[in-house]
Amino acid sequence: MIRSALDSKDLAKRGESLIRQSSNRYLTTVRIAFRAKQRRFDDFDGLLEESSVKPVQRAIIELSDEQDQPDLLPG
């Protein structure tokens, strides 16, 4: 899912897809920011492995995967 050598074009496509498929661009941006903040604190707490992927990049990838593959979500 998350590669150490992140492709910037792929990341841009994922971000555009999130925005394009949302009904509210502002709320999507807030979701990305909130998820990035959570990941940043998880990194501080040592819950996540060391990664060269920045929290915002990780958030975009995770939200994009959740949008594209909803059957992976629990519940």
Curated annotation (Swiss-Prot):
It is an enzyme of class 2 (transferase). It comes from the Bacteria. GO terms for biological process: DNA-templated transcription. Its EC number is 2.7.7.6. GO terms for molecular function: DNA binding; DNA-directed RNA polymerase activity. It holds the Pfam family RNA_pol_Rpb6. GO terms for cellular component: DNA-directed RNA polymerase complex. Signal peptide: none annotated. NCBIfam families: PRK00392.2-5 (NF001574). Promotes RNA polymerase assembly. Latches the N- and C-terminal regions of the beta' subunit thereby facilitating its interaction with the beta and alpha subunits. This is DNA-directed RNA polymerase subunit omega. The lineage of its organism: Bacteria, Bacillati, Cyanobacteriota, Cyanophyceae, Synechococcales. The gene is rpoZ.
